[in-house]
From Swiss-Prot:
Location of Leucine amide modifications: L47, L103, L123, L159, L169
Subcellular location: Secreted
Organism: Helicoverpa zea (Corn earworm moth)
Misc remark: Juvenile hormone seems to allow PBAN release, which then induces pheromone biosynthesis.
Function (record text): A hormone that controls sex pheromone production in females and pheromone responsiveness in male. Also mediates visceral muscle contractile activity (myotropic activity).
Segment forming the signal sequence: 1-23
UniProt keyword annotations, A-Z: Amidation, Cleavage on pair of basic residues, Hormone, Neuropeptide, Pheromone response, Secreted, Signal
The protein's name in its UniProt record: PBAN-type neuropeptides
One Gene Ontology term of the molecular function aspect: neuropeptide hormone activity
Top-rank taxon: Eukaryota
Length: 194
């Protein structure tokens, strides 16, 4: 904050001194404007032209006015809430690197030790005979012999289903109670028989 004020005061003083100390005299031998073939003719100052030279006393007064304005600016800037004040710029540039490892990669590439992980089968799938399993797993996934059906080897029901079911309704009915000959007739004109 103080550095910003010093910079503002320095720029104000530099601008004032460059404006006040500006020399409007034409240098000897220098061509000016589009008419450079004046051949040593000297034209006097234009009538009514004001000089920008101010006496040294006026320079001091202007300098003090600039300092007073800079002080007032700093005072009102300090009165602003902290959220509205500009943060001081950082002098050094820091580059933050956030390291996110890729999935499946380890941080230590030299240490390639793999942990023994027990295999958990999917729901509804049976363990094959060649796949080793711990005794606890064998007991957990063993089913009752009554629930095991020969169809499960060829057809797997929904996940987690182990009960017997009939694929179509009416297939388990005994046909002894029904007559031997059933006549089924369909009408072509969509009429119903009563």
């Amino acid at each position: 904050m103080f550095n910003q004020t010093q910079l503002f005061v320095f720029l104000a003083v530099f601008t004032t001194s460059s404006v006040l100390g500006n020399n409007n005299d034409v240098k000897d031998g220098a061509a000016s404007g589009a008419h450079s073939d004046r051949l040593g003719l000297w034209f006097g100052p234009r009538l009514g032209k004001r000089s920008l030279r101010i006496s040294t006393e006026d320079n001091r007064q202007a300098f003090f006015k600039l300092l007073e304005a800079a002080d007032a600016l700093k005072y009102y800037y300090d009165q602003l809430p902290y959220e509205m004040q500009a943060d001081e710029p950082e002098t050094r540039v820091t580059k933050k690197v956030i390291f996110t490892p890729k999935l499946g990669r380890s941080l230590a590439y030299d240490d390639k030790s793999f942990e023994n992980v027990e295999f958990t089968p999917r729901l509804g799938r049976r363990l094959s005979d060649d796949m080793p399993a711990t005794p606890a797993d064998q007991e957990m996934y063993r089913q009752d012999p009554e629930q095991i059906d020969s169809r499960t080897k060829y057809f797997s029901p929904r996940l987690g289903r182990t009960m017997n079911f009939s694929p179509r309704l009416g297939r388990e009915l005994s046909y002894d109670m029904m007559p031997n000959k059933i006549r089924v007739v369909r009408s072509t004109n969509k009429t119903r028989s009563t």
